Amino acid sequence: MSSQPGDPATLPAQSSLSFTQGFLLGQLSVVLVLAAFIKFFIFGEAPPPPSRGLSHRSATHRRSNSIYSNSPQEAGSRSLREKPSTSNVLRPVPSSSTNTRSILRKTYYSAIPTNPAKHGRLRIHHSSHQPESLDWFNVLIAQTIAQYRQTAYSLKDSPTSSILNSLTAALNNPEKKPAFIDKITVTDISLGEEFPIFSNCRIIAVDDPNSDGGRLQALMDVDLSDDNLSIAIETQLLLNYPKPCSAILPVALSISVVRFSGTLCISLVPASTPPLDTPSHSPSPPTADTATSGRSKPGDKAGGNQPRSNGSTEDPAGGNPPKTSPKSNVAFSFLPDYRLDLSVRSLIGSRSRLQDVPKVAQLVEARVQAWFEERVVEPRVQVVGLPDLWPRMGRTGVRTGDDAETASNGPRSTVSADIGGSARHEELAREPEALRFRGLLGARPPFDVASRTSSFNVETGDLRSRSMTRQESSGDLSDQLHIPGSLPEAVTPG
């Protein structure tokens, strides 16, 4: 008898087969899922982290691929196929990489509007970027100035490196000092106590025919208020007619910088840039090449220096100037809308003295203003060579301290300098009352105008400091004030 399709004997066999297939498929799927999880999540490589700051920038600020970013296979095959000569080892720098707009785009500075030049004038392109406060720059500048002041005070007794000797030699230059002025003696120098404050820094682009795409220039406001930045001198006016030294008029001056404010302009001058044009009546500003060979300063109008071309300074022997490799320079200047407030005090005469003559103050202020404008006020600039920043063992130093000693266990070079150490102990050992240097006193007592505690003598109408009061009490002042050939005693101040 044949079995029917609905026979119960065949149902357990079919159900067991379907159960086995389902079980095997389930186990296989679990194994595949575990294998995929282990491969891609445990042993897989983590994606590279995004560059900091790039995720928050717009698509227009993305860095463009460099022309040198070729694949390693192409670079390797090209280096094997091509054998460049020695002169072609260094790849040329494309003009697009040094363009002003390219630099601003790659440094994520805001774009500048296009303003064409009119009537051949240089057009300034102002940027919409927010100005910077320069707080960090003020700290660095303050530390540098403080170190210069401390170094100048520590070298005050040096016969060659003293700031007093340097100023005395500069003021008594025979090529610049007139014949009717006797030797100038520096009686008081104060390097100040405050520091300049820089703020509101912004980058602008200036049209320059010597560079592709113009020239970038940094503008920053500077302000300095310091009553202790002063210098006091003494000299004598000589009357050489009808005979030499027929009359002598003692003069004492003190100049203090009350306040200075202006806009500082800083720009880079590449080595390939031709020398800057200067007016015919003043020499061109020295570059890094001429600063080492010739020590002449620009704009010495009073000294009678003739204009020289940039880089054509000859040595004293009359030979050709030393040829050095061109270097990049930094040019800085101030805009004409600066403010320089000076305080000039004067004493004229030996016995009967004229104090704070207004005409003398006007002449001194005008001369200082002219000296400043001839050197660092637009269109004149000061050009300073950039230092060599390549790391060298001769300039390598090791900081003192436990952290530095434990971090580096290697042998130290014999030329390594110990930064700090003895200099720091000497600074703590001596605590100067003020950064003030006094020169040798001449036949007359010094004119101490930097000190704000001087008293006014009503009887004689002159200024007398504490040191002068002590000399008067000793009875030696009358002998010291007697100068042969001075004006007679009958002359009284008008």
From Swiss-Prot:
Protein name: Maintenance of mitochondrial morphology protein 1
Organism (species): Aspergillus clavatus (strain ATCC 1007 / CBS 513.65 / DSM 816 / NCTC 3887 / NRRL 1 / QM 1276 / 107)
Biased composition (Basic residues): 54-64
Pfam families in the record: MMM1
Domain text: The SMP-LTD domain is a barrel-like domain that can bind various types of glycerophospholipids in its interior and mediate their transfer between two adjacent bilayers.
GO CC terms, sorted: endoplasmic reticulum membrane; ERMES complex
Superkingdom in the source lineage: Eukaryota
Transmembrane residue ranges: 23-43
Subunit relationships: Homodimer. Component of the ER-mitochondria encounter structure (ERMES) or MDM complex, composed of mmm1, mdm10, mdm12 and mdm34. A mmm1 homodimer associates with one molecule of mdm12 on each side in a pairwise head-to-tail manner, and the SMP-LTD domains of mmm1 and mdm12 generate a continuous hydrophobic tunnel for phospholipid trafficking.
Location within or outside the cell: Endoplasmic reticulum membrane
Primary role: Component of the ERMES/MDM complex, which serves as a molecular tether to connect the endoplasmic reticulum (ER) and mitochondria. Components of this complex are involved in the control of mitochondrial shape and protein biogenesis, and function in nonvesicular lipid trafficking between the ER and mitochondria. The mdm12-mmm1 subcomplex functions in the major beta-barrel assembly pathway that is responsible for biogenesis of all outer membrane beta-barrel proteins, and acts in a late step after the SAM complex.
Record gene name: mmm1
Listed PROSITE patterns: SMP
Segments for region (Disordered): 50-98, 274-330, 398-426, 449-494
Topology, Lumenal side: 1-22
Family to which the UniProt record says this protein belongs: Belongs to the MMM1 family.
Membrane topology value: Single-pass type I membrane protein
GO function terms (MF aspect): lipid binding
Cytoplasmic side: 44-494
Positions with biased composition (Polar residues): 65-76, 85-98, 406-416, 466-477
Keywords assigned by UniProt, alphabetized: Endoplasmic reticulum, Lipid transport, Lipid-binding, Membrane, Transmembrane, Transmembrane helix, Transport
Major place of residence: endoplasmic reticulum
